[in-house]
A protein has these predicted regions:
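Short, polar N-cap/turn motifs at the start of nucleic acid-interacting alpha helices
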Residues: 168-175, 242, 261-280, 291
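N-terminal DNA-binding recognition helix of tyrosine site-specific recombinases/integrases
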Residues: 43-46, 54-66, 73-111, 156-159
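C-terminal secondary-structure termini that scaffold catalytic or DNA-interacting sites
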Residues: 201-205, 217-219, 296-302
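Catalytic-site neighborhood detector that most strongly recognizes the C-terminal catalytic loop/helix
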Residues: 123, 180-184, 270-295
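N-terminal DNA-binding module of tyrosine recombinases/phage integrases
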Residues: 1-65
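Basic, Lys/Arg- and aromatic-enriched nucleic-acid-binding interface segment
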Residues: 83-85, 98, 102-158, 162, ...
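C-terminal catalytic core of Y-nucleophile DNA break-rejoin enzymes
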Residues: 181-201, 210-233
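C-terminal catalytic core of tyrosine-transesterase DNA break-rejoin enzymes
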Residues: 98, 149, 153-160, 249-273, ...
Length: 302
Protein backbone atom coordinates (compact mmCIF):
# COMPACT_ATOMS: atom_id res chain seq x y z
CA UNK A 1 0.00 0.00 0.00
CA UNK A 2 1.03 3.62 -0.49
CA UNK A 3 0.88 6.00 2.42
CA UNK A 4 -0.04 9.03 0.27
CA UNK A 5 -1.33 9.64 -3.23
CA UNK A 6 2.22 10.39 -4.35
CA UNK A 7 4.20 7.10 -4.31
CA UNK A 8 7.47 8.94 -5.02
CA UNK A 9 7.24 10.49 -1.57
CA UNK A 10 7.76 7.04 -0.09
CA UNK A 11 9.94 5.49 -2.79
CA UNK A 12 13.29 7.17 -2.27
CA UNK A 13 15.43 5.12 -4.65
CA UNK A 14 19.15 5.64 -4.96
CA UNK A 15 19.87 6.08 -1.27
CA UNK A 16 22.56 4.14 0.57
CA UNK A 17 20.46 1.65 2.53
CA UNK A 18 16.92 0.68 1.66
CA UNK A 19 14.77 -1.14 4.18
CA UNK A 20 14.52 -4.18 1.90
CA UNK A 21 18.34 -4.45 1.92
CA UNK A 22 18.45 -4.20 5.70
CA UNK A 23 15.85 -6.97 5.91
CA UNK A 24 17.94 -9.16 3.58
CA UNK A 25 21.00 -8.64 5.79
CA UNK A 26 19.00 -9.38 8.95
CA UNK A 27 17.44 -12.47 7.38
CA UNK A 28 20.82 -13.86 6.41
CA UNK A 29 22.74 -13.04 9.58
CA UNK A 30 20.24 -12.99 12.44
CA UNK A 31 17.24 -15.15 11.59
CA UNK A 32 19.08 -18.49 11.82
CA UNK A 33 19.71 -17.94 15.56
CA UNK A 34 16.27 -16.60 16.48
CA UNK A 35 13.66 -18.87 18.08
CA UNK A 36 10.72 -17.55 16.09
CA UNK A 37 12.59 -17.33 12.80
CA UNK A 38 9.69 -18.32 10.54
CA UNK A 39 7.37 -15.81 12.16
CA UNK A 40 10.04 -13.11 11.80
CA UNK A 41 10.48 -14.02 8.15
CA UNK A 42 6.76 -13.65 7.39
CA UNK A 43 6.42 -10.36 9.24
CA UNK A 44 9.56 -8.83 7.76
CA UNK A 45 8.42 -9.85 4.28
CA UNK A 46 5.21 -7.87 4.89
CA UNK A 47 7.15 -4.79 5.98
CA UNK A 48 9.42 -5.14 2.96
CA UNK A 49 6.41 -5.25 0.65
CA UNK A 50 5.00 -2.06 2.15
CA UNK A 51 8.04 0.20 2.64
CA UNK A 52 11.00 -1.82 1.38
CA UNK A 53 12.03 0.88 -1.11
CA UNK A 54 12.41 3.58 1.55
CA UNK A 55 15.84 4.55 2.82
CA UNK A 56 16.07 3.43 6.45
CA UNK A 57 17.05 6.94 7.58
CA UNK A 58 13.78 8.25 6.17
CA UNK A 59 11.51 5.84 8.04
CA UNK A 60 9.72 7.85 10.70
CA UNK A 61 7.46 6.84 13.60
CA UNK A 62 4.51 8.29 11.67
CA UNK A 63 5.28 6.01 8.71
CA UNK A 64 5.19 2.96 10.96
CA UNK A 65 2.14 4.19 12.85
CA UNK A 66 0.22 4.64 9.59
CA UNK A 67 0.91 1.02 8.66
CA UNK A 68 -0.02 -0.19 12.15
CA UNK A 69 -3.39 1.46 11.79
CA UNK A 70 -3.77 -0.07 8.34
CA UNK A 71 -3.19 -3.53 9.81
CA UNK A 72 -5.66 -2.87 12.58
CA UNK A 73 -8.47 -1.41 10.48
CA UNK A 74 -8.11 -2.79 6.96
CA UNK A 75 -6.62 -6.19 7.69
CA UNK A 76 -8.60 -6.59 10.92
CA UNK A 77 -5.64 -7.97 12.81
CA UNK A 78 -5.83 -7.94 16.61
CA UNK A 79 -4.02 -5.29 18.64
CA UNK A 80 -1.72 -7.89 20.16
CA UNK A 81 -0.80 -9.14 16.67
CA UNK A 82 -0.15 -5.59 15.43
CA UNK A 83 2.10 -5.09 18.45
CA UNK A 84 3.97 -8.20 17.36
CA UNK A 85 4.49 -6.76 13.85
CA UNK A 86 5.93 -3.62 15.45
CA UNK A 87 8.12 -5.61 17.83
CA UNK A 88 9.69 -7.57 14.97
CA UNK A 89 10.42 -4.37 13.04
CA UNK A 90 11.84 -2.85 16.22
CA UNK A 91 14.16 -5.82 16.65
CA UNK A 92 15.44 -5.22 13.12
CA UNK A 93 16.10 -1.54 13.80
CA UNK A 94 17.71 -2.22 17.18
CA UNK A 95 20.20 -4.54 15.49
CA UNK A 96 20.87 -1.90 12.82
CA UNK A 97 21.56 0.71 15.52
CA UNK A 98 23.52 -1.27 18.11
CA UNK A 99 25.35 -3.90 16.09
CA UNK A 100 25.71 -2.55 12.58
CA UNK A 101 25.72 1.23 13.21
CA UNK A 102 23.55 1.74 10.14
CA UNK A 103 21.01 3.94 11.93
CA UNK A 104 21.22 6.58 14.62
CA UNK A 105 18.01 5.62 16.39
CA UNK A 106 15.13 3.15 16.33
CA UNK A 107 11.93 4.85 15.07
CA UNK A 108 9.82 2.15 16.75
CA UNK A 109 11.07 3.27 20.18
CA UNK A 110 8.83 6.35 19.93
CA UNK A 111 5.69 4.34 19.20
CA UNK A 112 3.36 3.41 22.03
CA UNK A 113 2.07 -0.16 22.02
CA UNK A 114 -1.64 -0.74 21.58
CA UNK A 115 -3.32 -1.74 24.81
CA UNK A 116 -4.04 -5.45 24.57
CA UNK A 117 -7.02 -7.26 26.06
CA UNK A 118 -6.30 -9.57 28.97
CA UNK A 119 -5.01 -12.87 27.67
CA UNK A 120 -7.27 -15.90 27.54
CA UNK A 121 -6.78 -18.78 29.96
CA UNK A 122 -8.39 -21.64 28.06
CA UNK A 123 -7.11 -24.91 29.46
CA UNK A 124 -7.94 -28.60 29.16
CA UNK A 125 -10.32 -30.21 31.59
CA UNK A 126 -9.24 -33.63 32.86
CA UNK A 127 -11.61 -35.34 30.45
CA UNK A 128 -10.45 -33.21 27.50
CA UNK A 129 -6.86 -34.01 28.36
CA UNK A 130 -7.54 -37.75 28.36
CA UNK A 131 -9.35 -37.57 25.02
CA UNK A 132 -6.62 -35.44 23.43
CA UNK A 133 -3.80 -37.73 24.55
CA UNK A 134 -5.73 -40.75 23.27
CA UNK A 135 -6.14 -39.02 19.90
CA UNK A 136 -2.42 -38.20 19.81
CA UNK A 137 -1.62 -41.88 20.35
CA UNK A 138 -3.56 -42.71 17.18
CA UNK A 139 -1.91 -39.97 15.09
CA UNK A 140 0.19 -40.88 12.06
CA UNK A 141 2.67 -38.30 13.33
CA UNK A 142 4.73 -40.45 15.70
CA UNK A 143 6.13 -37.46 17.58
CA UNK A 144 2.81 -35.80 18.35
CA UNK A 145 2.08 -37.63 21.62
CA UNK A 146 5.49 -36.87 23.11
CA UNK A 147 5.31 -33.24 21.95
CA UNK A 148 1.92 -32.73 23.62
CA UNK A 149 2.96 -34.59 26.78
CA UNK A 150 6.03 -32.37 27.03
CA UNK A 151 3.99 -29.22 26.39
CA UNK A 152 1.50 -29.99 29.17
CA UNK A 153 4.19 -31.17 31.59
CA UNK A 154 6.56 -28.25 31.11
CA UNK A 155 4.66 -25.18 29.90
CA UNK A 156 7.19 -24.74 27.10
CA UNK A 157 6.25 -22.79 23.99
CA UNK A 158 5.63 -24.64 20.74
CA UNK A 159 8.73 -23.29 19.04
CA UNK A 160 10.86 -24.03 22.10
CA UNK A 161 9.74 -27.66 21.98
CA UNK A 162 10.13 -28.19 18.25
CA UNK A 163 13.63 -26.68 18.22
CA UNK A 164 15.08 -28.67 21.14
CA UNK A 165 18.46 -30.07 20.21
CA UNK A 166 19.84 -33.12 21.98
CA UNK A 167 22.65 -31.08 23.57
CA UNK A 168 20.05 -28.99 25.42
CA UNK A 169 18.82 -32.00 27.39
CA UNK A 170 20.65 -32.48 30.70
CA UNK A 171 19.90 -36.07 31.68
CA UNK A 172 22.07 -35.90 34.81
CA UNK A 173 20.18 -32.98 36.35
CA UNK A 174 16.82 -33.74 34.75
CA UNK A 175 16.14 -30.57 32.83
CA UNK A 176 16.18 -28.87 29.42
CA UNK A 177 18.22 -25.71 28.85
CA UNK A 178 16.35 -23.05 26.89
CA UNK A 179 18.44 -20.20 25.51
CA UNK A 180 16.53 -17.00 24.80
CA UNK A 181 18.49 -15.24 22.06
CA UNK A 182 16.45 -12.05 22.35
CA UNK A 183 17.73 -11.16 25.83
CA UNK A 184 20.60 -13.65 26.30
CA UNK A 185 18.77 -15.37 29.15
CA UNK A 186 18.85 -19.06 29.93
CA UNK A 187 15.82 -20.88 31.30
CA UNK A 188 15.98 -24.27 32.97
CA UNK A 189 12.90 -26.46 32.45
CA UNK A 190 12.61 -29.39 34.91
CA UNK A 191 11.58 -32.60 33.15
CA UNK A 192 10.05 -35.68 34.77
CA UNK A 193 11.90 -38.98 34.86
CA UNK A 194 9.19 -40.57 32.71
CA UNK A 195 9.70 -38.01 29.92
CA UNK A 196 13.48 -38.25 30.13
CA UNK A 197 13.17 -42.00 29.67
CA UNK A 198 11.07 -41.44 26.52
CA UNK A 199 13.66 -38.95 25.24
CA UNK A 200 16.46 -41.47 25.73
CA UNK A 201 14.55 -44.23 23.95
CA UNK A 202 13.90 -41.89 21.01
CA UNK A 203 17.54 -40.80 20.86
CA UNK A 204 18.77 -44.40 20.90
CA UNK A 205 16.19 -45.61 18.40
CA UNK A 206 16.87 -42.82 15.90
CA UNK A 207 20.62 -42.61 16.63
CA UNK A 208 20.42 -38.87 17.28
CA UNK A 209 23.55 -36.82 18.02
CA UNK A 210 24.15 -33.61 19.96
CA UNK A 211 23.20 -31.13 17.22
CA UNK A 212 20.14 -33.06 16.01
CA UNK A 213 16.64 -31.83 16.73
CA UNK A 214 14.79 -34.10 19.16
CA UNK A 215 11.70 -33.63 16.99
CA UNK A 216 13.11 -33.50 13.47
CA UNK A 217 11.51 -33.66 10.05
CA UNK A 218 11.31 -37.17 8.63
CA UNK A 219 12.71 -35.91 5.33
CA UNK A 220 15.43 -33.64 6.69
CA UNK A 221 16.98 -34.01 10.14
CA UNK A 222 18.31 -30.47 9.87
CA UNK A 223 14.76 -29.11 10.10
CA UNK A 224 12.28 -29.24 13.00
CA UNK A 225 9.18 -31.36 12.59
CA UNK A 226 5.84 -29.78 11.63
CA UNK A 227 2.91 -30.85 13.80
CA UNK A 228 0.26 -28.29 12.87
CA UNK A 229 -1.96 -30.57 10.77
CA UNK A 230 -1.52 -33.55 13.09
CA UNK A 231 -2.43 -31.47 16.15
CA UNK A 232 -5.50 -29.98 14.43
CA UNK A 233 -6.68 -33.48 13.48
CA UNK A 234 -6.14 -34.73 17.03
CA UNK A 235 -8.27 -31.88 18.40
CA UNK A 236 -11.07 -32.82 16.00
CA UNK A 237 -10.93 -36.51 16.93
CA UNK A 238 -10.87 -35.63 20.63
CA UNK A 239 -13.74 -33.15 20.15
CA UNK A 240 -11.78 -30.41 21.91
CA UNK A 241 -13.11 -27.07 20.66
CA UNK A 242 -11.80 -23.49 20.78
CA UNK A 243 -8.28 -24.69 21.53
CA UNK A 244 -4.83 -23.78 20.17
CA UNK A 245 -1.44 -25.32 20.80
CA UNK A 246 -0.48 -22.31 22.92
CA UNK A 247 -3.38 -23.18 25.23
CA UNK A 248 -1.36 -26.21 26.36
CA UNK A 249 0.87 -23.63 28.04
CA UNK A 250 -2.19 -22.16 29.76
CA UNK A 251 -3.10 -25.71 30.76
CA UNK A 252 0.25 -26.16 32.51
CA UNK A 253 -0.06 -22.86 34.36
CA UNK A 254 -3.67 -23.56 35.34
CA UNK A 255 -2.85 -27.04 36.67
CA UNK A 256 0.04 -25.61 38.69
CA UNK A 257 -2.13 -22.83 40.09
CA UNK A 258 -4.88 -25.27 41.03
CA UNK A 259 -2.28 -27.42 42.80
CA UNK A 260 -1.36 -24.50 45.03
CA UNK A 261 1.98 -23.67 43.40
CA UNK A 262 2.94 -20.04 44.20
CA UNK A 263 2.42 -17.56 41.38
CA UNK A 264 6.09 -16.53 41.53
CA UNK A 265 7.12 -20.13 40.87
CA UNK A 266 4.69 -20.46 37.96
CA UNK A 267 6.09 -17.25 36.51
CA UNK A 268 9.63 -18.64 36.61
CA UNK A 269 8.59 -21.95 35.04
CA UNK A 270 6.83 -20.18 32.16
CA UNK A 271 9.65 -17.68 31.69
CA UNK A 272 7.37 -14.67 32.07
CA UNK A 273 9.28 -11.38 32.06
CA UNK A 274 6.98 -9.84 34.67
CA UNK A 275 4.78 -11.29 37.40
CA UNK A 276 1.83 -9.39 35.90
CA UNK A 277 1.82 -11.81 32.98
CA UNK A 278 1.15 -14.66 35.42
CA UNK A 279 -1.47 -12.90 37.54
CA UNK A 280 -4.29 -14.13 35.27
CA UNK A 281 -4.00 -17.52 37.02
CA UNK A 282 -4.38 -16.21 40.58
CA UNK A 283 -8.13 -16.80 40.68
CA UNK A 284 -7.56 -20.49 40.00
CA UNK A 285 -4.96 -20.62 42.74
CA UNK A 286 -7.14 -18.91 45.35
CA UNK A 287 -10.26 -20.90 44.45
CA UNK A 288 -8.54 -24.25 44.96
CA UNK A 289 -6.81 -23.13 48.14
CA UNK A 290 -10.20 -22.04 49.45
CA UNK A 291 -11.64 -25.43 48.51
CA UNK A 292 -8.80 -27.19 50.34
CA UNK A 293 -9.37 -25.11 53.48
CA UNK A 294 -13.09 -25.83 53.29
CA UNK A 295 -12.41 -29.59 53.26
CA UNK A 296 -10.23 -29.28 56.36
CA UNK A 297 -12.78 -27.07 58.05
CA UNK A 298 -15.64 -29.56 57.59
CA UNK A 299 -13.58 -32.17 59.41
CA UNK A 300 -12.49 -29.95 62.28
CA UNK A 301 -15.40 -27.59 62.87
CA UNK A 302 -18.56 -29.18 64.22
Amino acid sequence: IWLTKDPLTYSKLGRKYLLKDLIKKFTAERLPILKASEEYRRILFWWSEQIGEIDIKDISPSTIDHLRNYLLRNRRISKSRVNRYTAVLSSLFTTAVREWQLMESNPCSKIKKFKEPEGRTRYLSNEERRRLLDACKMSRNKDLLLVVELAISSGMRKNEILTIRIRQIDFDNGWINIYETKNDNKRIIPISAALLKKFQLKIDREKLVADDFLFHSERDRARPRCIRVAFTNALKIAKVEDFRFHDLRHTTASYLAMSGVPIQTISRILGHKTIQMTMRYTHLNSAHLREAIQKISTVIVE
